[in-house]
Amino acid sequence: VQASNGNTSIKLDGILWIKASGKWLAHAAQEEMFVPLELAKVKASIQNDTEIASPCNPNQQLRPSIETAMHAVLRHSVVLHVHSVNAIAWAIRLDGPDLLTERLDGLPWQWIPYAASGIPLAREIQKAVANRPETDVLILGNHGLVVCGPDCHAAEKLLGEVERRLAITPRRFPKPDTTVLAIIARFSRWQFPDVDLLHALGTDAASRKILRGGVLYPCQAIFLGPTMPLLPPAAVISKFTARWSGQDTTPVFVAVERSGVMLNEKMTSAERATLIGLVHVTLRTEESARLRYLKEAEVMGVLNQGAHGYKEVLVPEESMSLSEIRQFDWQPKTISKRNGTHRESSSSGRHRQHQRGA
């Protein structure tokens, strides 16, 4: 689980306790984390295709996860949805269902093709489990893993077993070339990563090839943007001088081919965690693997959904296509949903941002 991604729930006495949107499961012992919802009302909302019912406690400020509908349609008392890097490495493959047949043999599992988070995904799961109600494990295409159980202990034990079966040994990657990266470090706002693993996005040819192909899963687009900021070494000085030195429109990281990665000092902890997760996924994915990338409409749907929580992400105007987005720098405008105000930078004003999380 990276940052606010992933969600868990438990059903007790007709109440669905679901992780709050934007909350980190890693902070569950220190913060208020779960939102109580009347399960019957949530199911009615799904049936009527209306907004998920309000929390039982009207004074609670937390909002239920966007995946609340998915948790509600599953019969199990405990549902764990995680963004396992091993599971995602299988979930992005076109041959994933076939390859997992042997790995998950003996477990009541199903593959759910990619569907948008919320009610669309919940309905796909609802159809799948209607035919096989014994299902306890779901691999969500281009998304992650769901395991279920009658209680917390059983669900956690099953999660461990599935993770063991899905485990992939990551590739080794070349060490970074700090000569080129040191040039970037001279510019304000840029720093070396404190996790060497991140350099793989620049030094590992297979990872670069994989990420050039597009967006692999929603959180990649939500937290890191729809395109990868990748530069050849020869372009470092010109690009930073002309575009990314001292501007507000810089990406949160940049990968330099055969050299490594540098981070923007404004990178948030959520963006950092998501980037680390992305590297883990690419290093577990074979260069020759046939991958399913999110389609343009799916990426745009993710960026426009605006319901994931508290992460600010770039959302282009409806008239723009994903290919047009690539012509622009990232994050030119921020809109605050709380007060309706906005600020615009010096670059194109054809973008806006929403608040989102998991």
Q: Language-model segments: what does each one mean?
A:
Residues V1-S347, H351-R352:
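Glycine-rich flexible loops
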Residues H354-R356:
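Cationic, low-complexity basic patches in intrinsically disordered or flexible, solvent-exposed regions
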